[in-house]
Amino acid sequence: MTRDLTPVEARIVGVLVEKQSTVPDTYPLSLNSLVAGCNQKTTRDPVMTLTDAQVLLAIDELKSLHLVLEGSGSRVVRYEHNLGRVLGVPGAAVALLATLMLRGPQTAAELRAHSERLHRFADVSSVEGFLDELAEKSPPRVLKLPRAPGAREARWVHLLCGEVDVAALSVGGAASQMAGGAADDELALLRAEHKQVLAEVALLRSQVQRLADELGVNLDPA
């Protein structure tokens, strides 16, 4: 690539990569489908609200970079990505880059889970291997952020939009992972309380049945 991408351009490329695998029957994408994919409320960070005009303008720029190709042979203009060829990387690396472009910084484990529909990685080590290769390219395509205090794992970020604010992203990652850890702890507590309630209910039923037996009362419904 001859220049860094804008956030809108990165979103468009990420959507095209994603939809190639998730909705192959409608790929390449029409403008309407592409805009809808860019503006999804789920699996997107940040959430965007792009207009047709904004997407078309970005597509023109991406076409000049050979990252997006315009399909032919259809009454509706359709678009497809060319990311792997432009960067000279395999499909597995393309899947990781797209997931980072769509969801923001993530750990290797998160990337493996989130990119499953685009590419199945055997394990987290496989993900880390492709990330290391992308990081060693010239220029680097991804960066491993420093593991922040309190964070369980280091996160990765793509560099297709240029340099990033490492300090800000590291702090944000720590807060996110700590929040995730707190949610896990709360869920474990709720499960423990649920088990305790079930045990108490079982004990009460046993006591009621024993009392009924002593009184000669039949508790079974007629």
Swiss-Prot record:
Q: Which InterPro entries match?
A: DUF480 (IPR007432), WH-like_DNA-bd_sf (IPR036388), WH_DNA-bd_sf (IPR036390)
Q: What is the residue range of the signal peptide feature? A: none
Family, as annotated: Belongs to the UPF0502 family.
Name the Pfam families for this protein.
DUF480 (PF04337)
Q: Which domain of life is it from?
A: Bacteria
* Record-given protein name: UPF0502 protein Lcho_2066
